[in-house]
Structures are given as C-alpha cells and as structure tokens.
Design a protein with these regions (language model features):
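Divalent metal-dependent catalytic cores for phosphoryl transfer on phosphate-bearing substrates
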Residues: 41-108
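An amphipathic alpha-helix signature
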Residues: 4-8, 29, 33, 84, ...
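Active-site flanking loop/helix segments enriched in acidic
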Residues: 2-24, 61-72
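Residues at alpha-helix boundaries and short interhelical turns
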Residues: 15-18, 39-43
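A positional/architectural concept
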Residues: 27-34, 38-40, 47
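Short N-terminal secondary-structure initiator segments
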Residues: 1-12, 78, 85, 91
Length: 108
C-alpha cells in the first residue's frame, strides 16, 4: 500500500484535516528531499524519505486538537506513537519508526 492509500484509508471522513495533513506533510517531504538530494554521496533512499515524510503525522487523526480539526480522544503529543501503531498495522515498521521518533525524543 502506498502513502496515498494509507492516508485515504484513515482520513476519508475528515476532508478538512486531510487537507491540513497533506499540505503540511508535502512541505516536510519537499524539505527532506531537498536536503537529501544535496548529499548524493550518502545514497539515500529518496522514495522512503518521501513516504516517511508524508506519513509522519498520520496519527493526528486520533488526537484531540480541535484547532487543526482533530477530534479524537488522545493528547496531541501522542500522535507520533499512535501513528507508529497505525503504520505497523499496515506492515510498515520502518516508516513507523520515523513516525514515533519525530516528536522530540520519541517519548511521546
């Protein structure tokens, strides 16, 4: 399953939040890819970088953050851990690690 299918799966009922997520994640992906492309000597996996950037905030759907149209029950600080659980359930453990570790020290 690609990142678009995963976002569509979890965000089908909240178009406003989906738009916010896609705009933010696209900006993160552009920045991450720009940085990665400046270092061809590292042989980075650009496809993985794009996918991970697009999915890093997937867990916000389960949080309570009405200012950004999130109406779940969990504290926002947990969105990385929640997203990691979602991505592991989708068979994406490598992406899950990025998700759970992008918020501070990964202790959310």
């Amino acid at each position: 399953m690609n990142w678009r299918q995963i976002i569509d799966k979890y965000y089908s009922d909240n178009a406003e939040l989906k738009d916010i997520l896609l705009r933010h994640s696209s900006a993160v992906a552009r920045k991450a890819l720009d940085i990665a492309k400046r270092h061809p000597e590292l042989n980075l996996d650009l496809n993985f970088i794009e996918e991970a950037a697009m999915l890093h905030d997937i867990g916000v759907i389960k949080t309570d953050a009405p200012d950004i149209k999130c109406y779940g029950n969990e504290p926002y600080i947990r969105h990385g851990v929640l997203g990691a659980e979602m991505l592991r359930a989708e068979g994406m453990p490598r992406h899950a690690r990025v998700c759970e570790r992008h918020t501070g020290a990964g202790l959310s």
